[in-house]
Every structure is written in structure tokens, then in C-alpha cells.
Curated annotation (Swiss-Prot):
Cofactor(s) this protein cannot do without: pyridoxal 5'-phosphate
Top enzyme category: lyase
Role this protein plays: The beta subunit is responsible for the synthesis of L-tryptophan from indole and L-serine.
Any Pfam family hit: PALP
Keywords: Amino-acid biosynthesis, Aromatic amino acid biosynthesis, Lyase, Pyridoxal phosphate, Tryptophan biosynthesis
Family the entry assigns: Belongs to the TrpB family.
Domain of life: Bacteria
GO cellular component: cytoplasm
Name under which the protein is recorded: Tryptophan synthase beta chain
Organism of this sequence: Salmonella typhimurium (strain LT2 / SGSC1412 / ATCC 700720)
InterPro entries cross-referenced by the UniProt entry: Trp_synth_b_CS, Trp_synth_beta, Trp_synth_beta/beta-like, TrpB-like_PALP, TrpB-like_PALP_sf
Reaction catalysis annotation: (1S,2R)-1-C-(indol-3-yl)glycerol 3-phosphate + L-serine = D-glyceraldehyde 3-phosphate + L-tryptophan + H2O
PROSITE patterns according to UniProt: TRP_SYNTHASE_BETA
């Protein structure tokens, strides 16, 4: 196997796919490498990010939730991006690559529906057909996003096999692509999967961290003590981390979904509580049974409900450059409510996991002077019905 770029991060990553898909992956890598060196492609991408998506996004200082502590907390506002989440960044890049390769169709998978919405809007903008695979359970719990996708002309295909969630949608999307790659581009939604996707997605998300670095230096005159992001597959987190990896004074903290609690087994934290295996075209930590079957992941947030994690996160964890922790459903929900009530911002449940860890750091050491940045990866409009039902069942509303 000869590739232009290194397909591994330490021992993690690779291209564990059927032989039939190798030409498609090689073509994609070649297109990406040439596009990265092409000023015209870069100018087109930058123009879409600025004038269509609305970059740069704001870096907002929290006014109220840090009261009584010595923490300064900023939110990187990816929730303000067109489409409602960080997902829009990299799909614009991938859609331009698809056009560059002469493809006419986009295949995508989605969990929370945010990547589906982003894929649909990019396809509509650039005149590409779009079909999106989504677990049947996620279709139910994310109905507003399903309608958004269909409004923009995408075909949404519910997947009923397995657990009817994101991992099953990924499997169906790959199956489709293996028979249609000559005309279709598979628009993978996270920094995981077979090479070159983890690298492509990181590079098409790295403006998150680049902007954050410039903005925090402008506002505070120094780098943050830590940047914090939620981790499912890990695209928003690697986008935030990438530009800080060589700044060793900056802590990188990834927050996995602890679900009902790690001890219950109902979580989505393979990085700290899984075992290394082969899944979704890559070698990475994953949740698996004693005999190596992929175990069901669980999270209150559909976008974190994924049984594996991107290979660069696995590598950063293995060398100790990044720390990975977990936050339960209940902790994320409390953070969601806190931001709504005290800052007037409705965060996605995914992003609420990262916020919850920042609040925990703040509460545990109120006397510690610390400068933290949370990547607020998406807005919570899609989650209000889920939160409403939980709060109603608890008698809180």
C-alpha cells in the first residue's frame, strides 16, 4: 500500500477497507494533496467559509457563570456558523473536492443530523445530489434536522439494522459507496474512518483552533491554560486541538460521553474504556465485547453516540499530549441548563459535555486562576424536544 501521506498516527489509523474501495481512497488522497497546494482551491474554500458560512466565529467571554471563581471562560462559537454547528466547515471543503474529482453525488451518514444538514446544504449550494444514511432511532429523535435535510433536497434513508444508530448508518453508507464510488463521493462526517479522512477532516476543521489562538491572544494577551472539546468521532476537538498541539503549555482536554455512568456500561467512551480493534476502516480504540464484537455505545446526545474514536485522538492520548475524561448525561444536562439560564445561549447536548467539564474544573478549584476555552461546537435547537421530555418526566417543568 503506497500513500502520499502517512496513513497512521502512531499505531492508529490505516486503510482497513475492501480492495474495491482502494482506488476511491487513493483518488481522494491525490485530490486533497493537490488541492492543498492549489491557491485557487484555497481561495474558493476561504470565500465560502467567510461569505457563506460566516467565519470567523466569535470567541465569547462568559459573563455570569464564572462568578465567585478566578476562572476566565471563553466559548468558541461554532454554534453561530451557518447550519448550526462546526460540521459546515469541513463539508464545504469535501464538497469542493468532490467537484474537483468530477463526482455528481454525495453519500453521507449522520447521527445528530448536523452532519446531514451540513452535507445537504453544501450539496444544494454546489449542485450535487445527496443521499444521507441515518439510524432509524436518530431519525425519530432528530426530526427537525431530518426535515431540514429534505427541504434542501437530500434523500434521507433510515437504517433499521443493528442498533439503528450512527454506527449502522456508517456501515450502510460505506456499503453504498463501494458500489457507486465512480460517480459518488463519500462525505465522512468526522475525523475517523480510513485514511485519508482523518487528515482531511482535521485540515478542513483546523481554522477553529487557528481563529481561537488569534482571538484569545488579542483578548487576553496569552494562550489559554486549556482548550476543551467534546469527543465522539472527534472532528470538532481535533479542529480545536490541531493548532495548539505544539504549544505544550496549553492543555488539550477531550470529553467523551459517560452516558448513564461508565460503571453501567451504557456510555460512549471507547478512548478511556475500550480496547483497540479494527472498525470503520481504521485501527482505533472501540467499545467491544470479550469476543471482539462491536458493543453498542450510548449517549443522551446522538452526535456522540459512536463506539469508536478518531485515530489522532487515540495517538494524542497514548503519548499523553491530550487528556480525555468523561461526562455523564446528567452532568451535560445541568451544563445545558446553566448556559441557557445564565448566559442566554442554548448549546448542543454534545457541546454541553465539554462545558460541563469546564464547570467542574472551575468548581473544584475556585481559587485557581485559569483561562479556559470551550469549543461550543453546535447550537441546541435540535435538542430542545429531548431536553423538554426529560425535564417534564422529572417534574422540573
Amino acid at each position: 500500500m503506497t500513500t502520499l501521506l502517512n496513513p497512521y498516527f502512531g499505531e492508529f489509523g490505516g486503510m482497513y477497507v475492501p480492495q474495491i474501495l482502494m482506488p476511491a481512497l487513493n483518488q481522494l488522497e491525490e485530490a486533497f494533496v493537490s488541492a492543498q497546494k492549489d491557491p485557487e482551491f484555497q481561495a474558493q474554500f476561504a470565500d465560502l467559509l467567510k461569505n457563506y458560512a460566516g467565519r470567523p466565529t466569535a470567541l465569547t467571554k462568559c459573563q455570569n457563570i464564572t462568578a465567585g471563581t478566578r476562572t476566565t471562560l471563553y466559548l468558541k462559537r461554532e454554534d453561530l456558523l451557518h447550519g448550526g454547528a462546526h460540521k459546515t466547515n469541513q463539508v464545504l471543503g469535501q464538497a469542493l473536492l468532490a467537484k474537483r474529482m468530477g463526482k455528481s453525488e454525495i453519500i453521507a451518514e449522520t447521527g445528530a443530523g448536523q452532519h446531514g444538514v451540513a452535507s445537504a446544504l453544501a450539496s444544494a449550494l454546489l449542485g450535487l445530489k445527496c443521499r444521507i444514511y441515518m439510524g432509524a432511532k436518530d431519525v425519530e429523535r432528530q426530526s427537525p434536522n431530518v426535515f431540514r435535510m429534505r427541504l434542501m433536497g437530500a434523500e434521507v434513508i433510515p437504517v433499521h439494522s443493528g442498533s439503528a444508530t450512527l454506527k449502522d448508518a456508517c456501515n450502510e453508507a460505506l456499503r453504498d459507496w463501494s458500489g457507486s464510488y465512480e460517480t459518488a463521493h463519500y462525505m465522512l462526517g468526522t475525523a475517523a474512518g480510513p485514511h485519508p479522512y482523518p487528515t482531511i477532516v482535521r485540515e478542513f476543521q483546523r481554522m477553529i483552533g487557528e481563529e481561537t489562538k488569534a482571538q484569545i491572544l488579542d483578548k487576553e494577551g496569552r494562550l489559554p491554560d486549556a482548550v476543551i472539546a467534546c469527543v465522539g468521532g472527534g472532528s470538532n476537538a481535533i479542529g480545536m486541538f490541531a493548532d495548539f498541539i505544539n504549544d505544550t503549555s496549553v492543555g488539550l482536554i477531550g470529553v467523551e460521553p459517560g452516558g448513564h455512568g461508565i460503571e453501567t456500561g451504557e456510555h460512549g467512551a471507547p478512548l478511556k474504556h475500550g480496547r483497540v480493534g479494527i472498525y470503520f476502516g481504521m485501527k482505533a480504540p472501540m467499545m467491544q465485547t470479550a469476543d471482539g464484537q462491536i458493543e453498542e455505545s450510548y449517549s443522551i446526545s446522538a452526535g456522540l453516540d459512536f463506539p469508536s474514536v478518531g485515530p489522532q485522538h487515540a495517538y494524542l492520548n497514548s503519548i499523553g499530549r491530550a487528556d480525555y475524561v468523561s461526562i455523564t448525561d446528567d452532568e451535560a444536562l445541568e451544563a445545558f441548563k446553566t448556559l441557557c439560564r445564565h448566559e442566554g445561549i442554548i448549546p448542543a447536548l454534545e457541546s454541553s459535555h465539554a462545558l460541563a467539564h469546564a464547570l467542574k474544573m472551575m468548581r473544584e478549584q475556585p481559587e485557581k486562576e485559569q483561562l479556559l476555552v470551550v469549543n461550543l461546537s453546535g447550537r441546541g435547537d435540535k435538542d430542545i424536544f429531548t431536553v423538554h421530555d426529560i425535564l417534564k418526566a422529572r417534574g422540573e417543568i
